[in-house]
């Protein structure tokens, strides 16, 4: 019943919004911690436990079912779920190949100073895999991969820190493009939970500027992007 309700809503959404090509059916930040405000994203009743062995496979199976249900009525449209926290690690199975109309938004966090191609551990302390290996494992399951990228830390300790993710960010963009990423979403505030409420442009414009220009052309160097902007500021 839930599956059909979601499919019906997705079909209605695309009919109402014909210019949209993707709709999310994914969870938010829920990380499986009972103390998390997002914990309710994951039902753990007996039926749901029978549905899948873990959160990742539950999301994959659910997305596959919804994708099949909307395919005929929504040609050329896709649905998306997140590879994030409990669903970050690709499962060790080939039984859950992706539908053509299912997209996975893989969320890279951590490793803000590291190159993906050199081995960028997401969180070794809790046993998560190398980002690049995990990325390839999702591709091997047939998923179109979008990328959610946070170039700065979601921490109030960073709110007054001048931070530019330069050559690392640009090289990581190249790696993602070379490995088939179709869409990149940049997420970096301003969020009053961990950023300045006012005056954030003074300290964040270089980070955002390099990110934006780099997405237009990731073959530019850090100096190519930022030096002309700094010279214009100096001239003013």
Task: Please report, for each region that a protein language model flagged, where it lies by residue.
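Catalytic-core regions of glycoside hydrolase
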Residues: 1-4, 8-227, 232-234
């Amino acid at each position: 019943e839930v599956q059909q309700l979601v499919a019906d809503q997705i079909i209605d959404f695309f009919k109402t919004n014909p210019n949209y090509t993707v709709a999310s059916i994914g969870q938010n930040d829920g990380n499986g911690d009972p103390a998390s405000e997002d914990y309710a994203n994951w039902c753990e009743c007996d039926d749901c436990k029978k549905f899948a062995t873990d959160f990742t496979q539950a999301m994959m199976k659910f997305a596959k079912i919804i994708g099949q249900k909307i395919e005929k009525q929504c040609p050329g449209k896709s649905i998306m779920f997140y590879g994030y926290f409990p669903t970050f690690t690709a499962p060790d199975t080939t039984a859950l190949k992706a539908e053509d109309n299912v997209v996975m938004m893989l969320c890279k966090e951590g490793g803000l100073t590291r190159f993906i191609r050199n081995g960028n551990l997401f969180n070794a302390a809790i046993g998560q895999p190398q980002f690049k290996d995990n990325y390839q494992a999702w591709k091997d399951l047939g998923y179109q991969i979008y990328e959610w990228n946070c170039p700065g830390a979601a921490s109030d300790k960073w709110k007054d820190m001048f931070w530019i993710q330069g050559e690392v960010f640009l090289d990581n963009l190249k790696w993602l493009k070379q490995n088939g990423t179709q869409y990149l979403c940049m997420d970096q505030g301003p969020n009053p939970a961990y950023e300045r409420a006012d005056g954030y442009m003074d300290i964040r414009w270089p980070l955002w500027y390099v990110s934006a220009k780099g997405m237009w052309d990731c073959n530019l160097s850090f100096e190519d992007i930022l030096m002309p902007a700094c010279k214009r500021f100096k001239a003013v």
